[in-house]
From Swiss-Prot:
It is an enzyme of class 2 (transferase). Keywords: ATP-binding, Isoprene biosynthesis, Kinase, Nucleotide-binding, Transferase. The active site is at K11, D137. Pathway: Isoprenoid biosynthesis; isopentenyl diphosphate biosynthesis via DXP pathway; isopentenyl diphosphate from 1-deoxy-D-xylulose 5-phosphate: step 3/6. The lineage of its organism: Bacteria, Pseudomonadati, Thermodesulfobacteriota, Desulfuromonadia, Geobacterales. It comes from Citrifermentans bemidjiense (strain ATCC BAA-1014 / DSM 16622 / JCM 12645 / Bem) (Geobacter bemidjiensis). Belongs to the GHMP kinase family. IspE subfamily. This is 4-diphosphocytidyl-2-C-methyl-D-erythritol kinase. Its EC number is 2.7.1.148. GO terms for molecular function: 4-(cytidine 5'-diphospho)-2-C-methyl-D-erythritol kinase activity; ATP binding. GO terms for biological process: isopentenyl diphosphate biosynthetic process, methylerythritol 4-phosphate pathway; terpenoid biosynthetic process. InterPro entries: GHMP_kinase_C_dom, GHMP_kinase_C_sf, GHMP_kinase_N_dom, IspE, Ribosomal_Su5_D2-typ_SF, Ribsml_uS5_D2-typ_fold_subgr.
């Protein structure tokens, strides 16, 4: 039977504004999102045996319907008239519960892969409509471009220009519940009319953008996250920010050599996950 081997990239948020709480319980967001080349490796294969099977082998990542990738495959299998099974194998490279969108990226990659394998012919726009029902970040990974994300993250506008940057990701191994962060968020009164540029020509302009309304909540419970920012800045980052709801913090560097050196030194000195990656 046919199979595909695909990469599911992580993301960072250069900016995350929480504008308010919606009647449906979700929060109104405004984010600048960027993919990076730290990727989970996903194999999707059709099978003669009915059903969906997900194998991951990473502690804390479920193999059955509790896995968002399983639910993505199920959503598309229901649209097909083919009597086949789907086998998904995920090699996790992206830290789990880390604010890097690994689960959402896996789901988006499965949507795109199963769409191809089952020859459904669904457009990216249709896959994004299906994806947002699985998770708010899923449409971004189908979109495949640096984007301004609004609403719950499902209204996407491509950035006109954004520089290719070297980024160091640092994760201390702390699992942060996104739901917990939003439940403990104290809303301020940001101005929804604030203009967020759609074009960034330099590292300096991206650094000026860095802001995350969720950071005080996560740092309040896990002060180590604040320490990570200082560690990155001391290591030469031009700017540093927590990604998503944490606990990963990223630093923006001027060159590949500076990023790789910083990642190696941080991993050696602290024992944390540290990786030099490129924006894509």
């Amino acid at each position: 039977m046919k199979k595909l081997q695909l990469l599911a990239p992580a993301k960072v948020n250069y900016r995350l504004d929480v504008l308010g709480k919606r009647p449906d319980g979700y929060h109104e967001l405004r984010m600048i999102m960027q993919r990076v080349d730290l990727c989970d490796e996903i194999e999707i294969a059709l099978s003669d045996s009915p059903g969906i099977r997900v194998t991951c082998g990473r502690k804390g990542v479920p193999d059955g319907p509790g896995n968002i990738a399983w639910r993505a495959a199920d959503a598309l299998l229901k649209l097909s008239d083919k009597e086949v099974g789907i086998e998904i194998t995920i090699a996790k490279k992206i830290p789990v519960g880390a604010g890097l969108g690994g689960g959402s990226s896996d789901a988006a990659t499965v949507l795109m892969g199963v769409n191809e394998l089952l020859e459904l012919g669904l457009t990216d726009e249709r896959l994004m409509e299906i994806g947002v029902k699985l998770g708010a970040d899923v449409p971004f990974f189908v979109f495949k471009k640096p984007a301004l994300a609004e609403g719950i993250g499902d209204r996407l506008t491509a950035l006109e220009e954004v520089p290719s940057l070297w980024v160091v990701l640092v994760n201390p191994g702390i699992h942060v519940s996104t739901a917990w962060v939003y439940q403990n968020l104290r809303l301020t009164t940001p101005d929804p009319a604030t203009i967020i540029p759609r074009s960034y020509s330099s590292l300096n302009e991206v650094c000026e953008l860095l802001s995350n309304d969720l950071e005080p909540v996560t740092c309040g419970r896990f002060p180590l996250v604040s320490e990570l920012k200082e560690v990155l800045l001391t290591a030469g980052a031009r700017g540093s920010l927590m990604s998503g709801s944490g606990s990963t913090v990223f630093g923006l560097f001027e060159s590949e050599s500076a990023a790789r050196h910083a990642a190696a030194e941080i991993a050696k000195a602290r024992g944390w996950f540290a990786a030099a990656v490129r924006t894509i």
